[in-house]
A protein has these predicted regions:
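Short, acidic, metal-binding catalytic loop of nucleotide-sugar glycosyltransferases
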Residues: 21-30
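A conserved acidic beta->alpha catalytic loop
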Residues: 37-48, 67, 535
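Nucleotide-activated donor-binding/catalytic signature segment of Leloir-type glycosyltransferases, i.e.
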Residues: 53-61, 537-565
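Glycine-rich, basic loop-to-helix element that forms the pyrophosphate-binding segment
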Residues: 64-82
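A recurrent flexible, glycine/aromatic-enriched loop bordering the glycosyltransferase active site
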Residues: 73, 124, 138-176
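Membrane-proximal helix-turn-helix segments that form the acceptor-binding/catalytic region
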Residues: 406-445
Length: 764
């Protein structure tokens, strides 16, 4: 199908030169370029035409009006000069086309004979703008557009989604549509609204207005038609709304829904990959939250300029992938297809997002599949020991009686222990450890957050070197479910002991309940507050006698204030199992509170090293009665000097910093070879269609088209009657939505003169 490109011109010779040269550089095939000057007073335009004429390019037709016709008639004359069998592209003179632009538009047109108009993506095209929707995204002249073109090509299925209207900066118009409904209506004069009217008439005639999501045309926002266009906005908007009263509602609904956001998100993801030459790191965790997730998010935030970070939260076949970019976090909900090999699933994700390194933090969410995939992956991976999962499926080393086993390595003892726990009875411990031995053997690095965690790893897998990098405190993490209003705490002089975090059985939930019960039975002058929640309930709660208060979920950035509010003197850890680090201990010390901890794991090591608290004896830890005795003794005012010394040590405890943790981890990343490029090139990227489905893409469907109202060629003068004035209706609607996202977007799209006219129609 031949295609003729019509460029209406009014002044702005520099824009015109740039536009023409871009068309000549990036357009091929059966096309003709029709450039029509609307009697521009600028002599530079005539000089530009003379230069073009001197080049004698057969594909260029130059036309000039003897008098100024206005944009609408000028565009119509240009379209009228097109070949009678050619589709037409109306192209503003302040645009710059890019590689493959016209081929992409032609493919779009060929995909469906019902397509009437086509608009490409642009930096400045209202509802077809990217990266920011409905905004003029400034594009410096020095910035290369090719990465964006490649990104759109990589992200395209294509789907060619419907639009409520095309955008006139670059509008492909099918010849059959011109034959069916005609050209732009001359009633729109010098311009504004003529393309919207055309698109609404196209829809009424059964044609589609669509977005071509694999084409990109820069719109650099020159002054092709001068300032008079804004002056005509009020008049032309009235004509448009009289003819198509549904127009504004459709556009408003479209902006509110923003249905092409997934298309933009995927394209921007690929643009980032092409334009940011930094390595990509894929972090993998389970979906249980807690300290592991806190650590990973802090590491990502602290090194986001040096690496492209992606976080997978894996739950079986469902992988939620977060892409952490400087402008936003994009979330993809991927599902492994039935029968799809795990190796293909992982390799496809790595190829799509340019992954150079996989950092495993916890694999309990998809163990078997991930082990299979990693065994065949050519992308280096490493492992941070956040729990004891590699050595025991219980993760916590707790037996059937919920007691710490002592990190037994004897397979016979472990088999008997697991057999007594229904959830793990079918696990063969020797096969379990062999799988993880193979995983660790291929790891490019192993990191432990504490010397204790490193020693446990060495106990089970002594052949592997481990680097100890303590977790740095990022200053807290926000959570949307945090309780914002703390419960009152009676001020009666009773000592308050706090437990911090989400407390399940392994963290000592049942032991805490028993400690509260014993406190009541003994009538102790003691209160317990859980800043967090129990596995049996998350809602804030306070017992009638005030002995136990449960705050609920908290924002860790507010923890110090909560500790002060609840008048906490001591932080207790009634844990049943060991910890590999404990962020809450760091937070307790940062608030100047000493801690009393079990005699196992990193808690015991950290308190022992600093003296910022007390380590329970084995007997005290094994018995809630003896544990409570020790807590009461610690809080006894007769031992105030000892307690105050622990407070001083807590306040002065040297805390691992986020900066040190990040620097040490980044040094490990950078020391690794980077052979992943070849592996990605050999792998089949997960398809754009699956990525869009993972972003929950749902194309917009236009409502049934209404036939346009018939108007005379001259617009009626304002009646002054608000009930009959469509702009009065628009003004009232705009007032209702002025502070919404949709309202702000519409405000950006409207010229100043139209906004002034709308404001004038509001009641005083």
């Amino acid at each position: 199908m031949p295609i003729d490109i019509v460029v209406p011109v009014y002044n702005a010779a520099d824009d015109l030169n740039r536009c023409i040269e871009s068309v000549l550089a990036h357009t091929s095939g059966d096309y003709r370029l029709i450039v029509i000057d609307d009697a521009s007073p600028d002599p530079a335009v005539r000089a530009c035409f003379a230069q073009l004429e001197a080049r004698r390019l057969p594909q260029i037709l130059l036309l000039a009006n003897e008098r100024n016709l206005g944009f609408t008639l000028n565009a119509n004359r240009g379209v009228g000069a097109a070949r009678p069998d050619a589709d037409v592209v109306l192209l503003n003179s302040d645009t710059v086309v890019t590689r493959g632009w016209l081929d992409a538009l032609a493919r779009c047109a060929a995909s469906d004979p019902a397509i009437g108009t086509i608009t490409p993506f642009s930096n400045n095209a209202e509802i077809c703008s990217l990266p920011r929707f409905c905004e003029n995204n400034r594009w410096p002249a020095s910035r290369d557009a090719e990465p964006m073109v490649q990104a759109l090509e990589r992200a395209a299925v294509p789907t060619y989604p419907d639009l409520p209207t095309g955008v006139g900066f670059c509008l492909y118009i099918r010849r059959a549509l011109i034959g069916a409904i005609g050209l732009f209506d001359p009633v729109f004069g010098l311009g504004y609204g003529e393309e919207n009217d055309l698109c609404m008439r196209a829809a009424a005639a059964g044609y589609r207005n669509v977005l071509c999501e694999d084409a990109f045309v820069l719109h650099l926002g020159g002054s092709s038609f001068g300032d008079k266009r804004a002056d005509l906005a009020e008049r032309n908007m009235r004509i448009l709304l009289d003819r198509h009263p549904q127009y504004l509602d459709q556009v408003r609904a479209y902006i509110t829904a923003d249905p092409v956001r997934p298309l933009r998100e995927l394209a921007l993801s690929q643009y980032r990959l092409l334009s940011e030459p930094v390595p990509g790191v894929l972090h993998m965790i389970h979906g249980h939250g807690g300290g592991t997730e806190y650590h990973v998010r802090a590491l990502i935030a602290a090194s986001c300029t040096a690496f492209r970070h992606y976080l997978v939260i894996a739950v079986g076949d469902e992988w939620q992938l977060e892409e952490h970019a400087s402008d936003a976090t994009r979330t993809y909900d991927f599902s492994r297809l039935p029968g799809e090999p795990w190796s293909d699933f992982l390799a496809g994700i790595c190829a799509r997002f340019g992954i150079d390194l996989i950092h495993l933090h916890n694999i309990s969410g998809c163990r078997d599949g991930l082990l299979q995939a990693l065994s065949s992956a050519e992308i280096p991976y490493g492992y941070t020991v956040h729990d004891l999962n590699f050595a025991c499926p219980t993760i916590t080393f707790l037996n059937a009686q919920h007691r710490y086993c002592g990190a037994v390595t004897d397979a016979a003892i472990c088999t008997a222990c697991l057999a007594a726990q229904p959830a793990f009875a079918a696990v063969g411990i020797e096969a379990w450890r062999e799988k993880h031995r193979a995983l660790l053997a291929q790891s490019a690095f192993l990191i432990a957050p504490s010397a204790w965690a490193a020693s446990i790893l060495a106990k089970y897998f002594p052949q592997h070197a481990v680097t100890v990098i303590p977790h740095g405190n990022a200053g807290g993490m926000s959570r949307p479910d945090a309780v914002r209003s703390p419960l009152p705490m009676p001020d009666d002089g009773r000592a308050v002991v706090a437990v911090l975090g989400a407390i399940g059985p392994d963290k000592g939930a049942r032991r805490l309940e028993r400690l509260v019960e014993l406190t009541r039975e003994r009538g102790l002058a003691l209160r317990w507050v859980l800043i967090g929640y129990l596995d049996r309930g998350r809602e804030p709660f306070q017992s009638a006698d005030g002995v136990f208060t449960m705050h609920g979920a908290y924002d860790s950035r507010a923890l110090r204030e909560l500790i002060e509010h609840y008048r906490v003197r001591l932080v207790a850890y009634p844990s049943a199992g060991p910890e590999t680090f404990s962020f809450t201990l760091s937070e307790a010390w940062a608030a100047g509170r000493p801690a009393i901890v079990p005699p196992i794991g990193a808690l015991a090591d950290r308190v022992g090293e600093t003296g910022a608290g007390w380590v329970l004896s084995d007997d005290e830890w094994s018995s809630e009665e003896l544990m409570l005795d020790r807590i009461v003794a610690v809080l006894d005012w007769s031992r105030a000097d000892e307690f105050n010394e622990a407070v001083t040590r807590a306040r002065s405890a040297v805390q691992p910093t986020l900066e040190a943790m990040t620097a040490a981890t980044v040094a490990i990343y950078r020391a690794l070879p980077q052979p992943a490029g070849k592996a990605r090139a050999a792998a089949q990227p997960i398809s754009a269609a699956r990525c869009l489905a993972a972003l929950h893409y749902a194309p917009w469907r236009p409502p049934p088209a209404a036939a346009p109202a018939q108007l005379p060629q001259q617009a009626a003068a304002p009646s002054g009657n608000a009930a009959r004035d469509p702009l009065a209706h628009v003004a009232r609607a705009a007032l209702r939505i002025r502070h919404t996202r949709t309202g702000r977007a519409l405000y950006r799209l409207a010229p100043a003169s139209l906004l002034a006219a709308l404001k004038a129609r509001l009641p005083r």
